[in-house]
């Protein structure tokens, strides 16, 4: 090969190298959707490094844009979620989506604390962790993704979502929408990512990945336990079995309406919903009558047995009936459905009935009569199983309300209202769908997904 031919070859090679697209970083097949877990997390890590350089106003801009652009999509997302998962109803899912979008706090949750004295000044501020691995459930898929995205992006993190395979389509659609909104606000791709095929194995890979700084797990006890074994910091939102106490001083009309509204909400899918009703015997009959006026159907003992056999075979929830309507449950049990579809099924049962002793996620509320308030509180403590999740009580006796709250030690305690008031729906306070009871964070917000840092200036800077 002569000099002229060699120069020609070199020019050709250089030309090809300059015009051939780089193979890294790996590009997603959709907005934030990758083929492999490693590709997705690596992309999210690179996005985080750039996001760290952005001012707080950029985070606020992303959240503001999310609130504006996702609002008209909340109803379609709710309908798609109900259709894909086969659980819950689109009307209540819309309300949950709206609460998550409107009531999840942003950067304003990252409050700064300063202490000054003769020795100088100490500043406490919240900083991001990095890439957070967030596991979302099929029971609350879109609302969890919206809620977690706002909280985690506000805290300065990037996010790898591990959605439930049963809510794959709607979850991936929403993740792509949020990724695109974030990109348009800050010019950074892949702040929110996932994989095209979310599986249990993919979740395991994510939990073991060295670039995942924190795990936020919204799901059952099994997936939370798996996360605990990862050796990483875990913010774990596990199961609950919320009891509802009604004593003889309660406003029975309001209590009946609140209980029906809470226990029927999204067909009882929320983990904070009333799962059992414990009522003082002297007012039990009147309360049940009032509940029927608000749309509850009281089952006979025979029909209760039929329903239990179908919905709780061997004492365990029939997954095919989780999150189904009361009418669908009746049909499955061979029980006639009234002309006016009931909002909630109720039945008088014993304290050891399977409907009472564990979380079922179905719109059937077991009612247990007890002799007095002390007995009600003792049973509620047993039913709650030490999960420290949620409890509800209806009473006009402030001392009893206070005693129940102190005794049950739940992350959420709702007094004289529907259960969903505890997450900012029809009640005060911010909204969250990640209630970290096993790991103790309780109702999570942006500051939950940030680490507290201490900056010290010595020798002065106190002007007192």
UniProtKB/Swiss-Prot annotation:
InterPro entries: Acetald_propionald_DH-rel, Ald_DH/histidinol_DH, Ald_DH_C, Ald_DH_N, Aldehyde_DH_dom. It catalyses: propanal + NAD(+) + CoA = propanoyl-CoA + NADH + H(+). CDD domains: ALDH_EutE. GO terms for molecular function: acetaldehyde dehydrogenase (acetylating) activity. Pfam families: Aldedh. Induction: BMC production is induced by growth on 1,2-PD vitamin B12 medium. Keywords: Bacterial microcompartment, NAD, Oxidoreductase. It is found in: Bacterial microcompartment. Disruption phenotype: Significantly impaired for growth on 1,2-PD/CN-B12, loss of propionaldehyde dehydrogenase activity. Releases decreased amounts of acetaldehyde when grown on propanediol. Its EC number is 1.2.1.87. Pathway: Polyol metabolism; 1,2-propanediol degradation. GO terms for cellular component: propanediol degradation polyhedral organelle. GO terms for biological process: propanediol catabolic process. The keyword Transferase does not apply. Residues 1-18 are annotated as: Targets protein to the BMC. NCBIfam families: PRK15398.1 (NF011927). A short N-terminal, probably helical sequence targets this enzyme and foreign proteins (tested with GST, MBP and eGFP) to the BMC. 10 residues give poor localization while 14 is better and 18 is better yet. The cargo is only detected by Western blot in broken shells, strongly suggesting this protein is normally found inside the BMC and not on its exterior. This N-terminal sequence interacts with the C-terminus of PduA, and possibly also with PduJ, to encapsulate PduP into BMCs. PduD and PduP compete for encapsulation in BMCs. Interacts with BMC shell proteins PduA and PduJ, which target this protein to BMC. Interacts with PduQ, probably via the N-terminus of PduQ. Interacts with PduK, probably with its BMC-containing N-terminus. Belongs to the EutE/PduP family. A CoA-acylating aldehyde dehydrogenase required for optimal 1,2-propanediol (1,2-PD) degradation. Optimizes growth in the bacterial microcompartment (BMC) dedicated to 1,2-PD degradation by minimizing propionaldehyde toxicity. Directly targeted to the BMC. NAD(+) and NADH are regenerated internally within the Pdu BMC by the PduP and PduQ enzymes, which reduce NAD(+) and oxidize NADH respectively, although there must also be cofactor transport across the BMC. The 1,2-PD-specific bacterial microcompartment (BMC) concentrates low levels of 1,2-PD catabolic enzymes, concentrates volatile reaction intermediates thus enhancing pathway flux and keeps the level of toxic, mutagenic propionaldehyde low. Bacterial microcompartments (BMC) 100-200 nm in cross section are formed during aerobic growth on minimal 1,2-PD-B12 or anaerobic growth on 1,2-PD-tetrathionate medium, but not during aerobic growth on glucose, anerobic growth on glucose or pyruvate-tetrathionate. BMCs can constitute up to 10% of total cell protein. This is Propanal dehydrogenase (CoA-propanoylating). It comes from Salmonella typhimurium (strain LT2 / SGSC1412 / ATCC 700720). The lineage of its organism: Bacteria, Pseudomonadati, Pseudomonadota, Gammaproteobacteria, Enterobacterales.
